[in-house]
Design a protein with these regions (language model features):
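Membrane-interface helix caps and helix-loop-helix hairpins in membrane proteins
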Residues: 80-84, 105-115, 135-139
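Core segments of transmembrane alpha-helices
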Residues: 58-79, 100, 123-128
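Hydrophobic alpha-helical membrane segments
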Residues: 93-104, 115-135, 151-154
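Transmembrane alpha-helical segments that form the membrane-embedded catalytic/substrate-channel core
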Residues: 17-27, 97-108, 152-167
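Cytosolic, membrane-interface loops and tails of multi-pass inner-membrane proteins
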Residues: 24-54, 165-176
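N-terminal signal-anchor transmembrane alpha helix
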Residues: 2-32
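Structural signature of hydrophobic alpha-helical transmembrane segments
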Residues: 85-95
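Terminal transmembrane helical module of multi-pass membrane proteins
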Residues: 131-176
């Protein structure tokens, strides 16, 4: 990618990713205190780990949001430095962020209300489309599909790790 394309495609994604992490950090605890029982009931039928909030405490959700931002930040820094595969790594991280954005929107629709990160997820949708179009001109559709699949795997792994951290920290705090 040229320096100009990094400025008008990559940096807005980095900025909205930072805002998304801040939104999750500042709204997660209050949201959890008001919606913990209703979210468990709403997700009884959804076994998929993408949507299940039970077993994930809010500190784990905050950690997952911050780690997601750090992944975008580090891949953007690598893109500035250049090197082998940096564009593809950034595109995969971008697709993972896009999948997480869609997950937040689906969670909000499923719960019929606000979830932490919803506002920036909605704001991200046009920006994701804006960034995905030039990327689709650079790479063929099958490579973009591969990035999306790898991004989905990263998003699922991030949610799975956040759930494990939540369960681990819950058992530690219960034993103290």
């Amino acid at each position: 990618m040229s320096a100009l394309s990094v400025l008008y495609i990559v940096l807005p994604i980095l900025a909205v990713s930072f805002c998304h992490a801040l939104e999750v950090v500042f709204t997660a605890r209050r949201w959890a205190s008001h919606h913990s029982a209703s979210s468990d009931e709403a997700h009884q039928s959804l076994v998929n780990i993408l949507f299940r909030l039970s077993g994930m405490n809010m500190s784990a959700l905050v950690i997952a949001a911050v780690v997601g931002f750090l992944a975008v930040l580090l891949s953007t820094a690598a893109l500035f430095v250049g090197g082998l595969w940096t564009e593809r790594i950034w595109a995969t991280i971008f697709m993972a962020y896009s999948v997480c954005t869609l997950i937040n929107i689906v969670r909000a629709v499923t719960l019929k209300g606000y979830v932490p990160g919803l506002v920036t997820s909605i704001i991200s949708v046009p920006l994701i489309a804006y960034a995905a179009y030039p990327l689709s001109l650079v790479w063929p559709w099958w490579e973009m599909l591969l990035f999306a699949i790898l991004g989905l795997v990263l998003a699922v792994a991030g949610h799975f790790i956040a759930q494990r951290i939540g369960r681990y920290s819950t058992t530690i705090s219960a034993s103290l």
